Amino acid sequence: MSLILNMLISIIVYSSPFSEDKLTPHICSGLQEPDSIQNRQELYNGIKWTNKYRKFDVSQFLFSDLFLQGTVTMNSKTYDNIRLKYDIVNDEIITPVNLEDIVQLNKEMVDSFSLQYDGRKYNFVNIKNDTLNNFSGYIQQLYSGRSSLFVKYNKSFSTSDDMNSDGTFNETQTIYFITEGLIYPITGIRTLYKVLMPDLIDEVKDYIRESRLKVSKKNPASFIDVIRYYDAISHINTD
């Protein structure tokens, strides 16, 4: 009886996810799909992540503090059903490896990723070349045609006098319109008009009015129909 009891204790101790061997992967289906670490070796080829902003009133992540369902494409290979958080303060994405460890993905290897949130899919691309207007790093791609529409998210922090808090984060977003190979930051519909083909502006205005579109910087996706229509009529105009 004593021998059996000792064997049971040994099994419990060495199979516990809280054992001292932190290198042993304890895959949780609630965190990641239960395929092998070897199959995702490239995905986990990053650095161990630690939270530097525990005492901030608002988190550094986009959309949610929780890990969101998503996909990641690294060196042209796509990984599905990945749990992700997008840190828009540092412009990095992280994923849990097991119950204990979280890894920050190797940004140089990431081509693109997506997040599922509130019933919508958000697609991001990694712009790896340094360019003007802060158009680099992870950027949400809203539309791609003859022209393109992107959104860059960011959070800046401000300090706090509260001894229980290090500060808070303030989220900002910048809309980018790309046409004819040129990048334009868009602060509203009026700034968009300034970079459209002059002879098509009135037609675009008529379309917005007749379609009763509400276009606002607060809702970057509201520009999609406008840009799509502009692409259609500019295609006719230039052919």
Task: Go through each PLM region and give its residues.
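Sec-dependent signal peptide cleavage junction
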Residues: 15-52
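Aromatic-patch recognition
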Residues: 53, 61-191
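Bacterial Sec-dependent N-terminal signal peptides
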Residues: 1-23, 226, 238-239
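Mixed-charge (acidic/basic) macromolecular-recognition segments
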Residues: 165-237
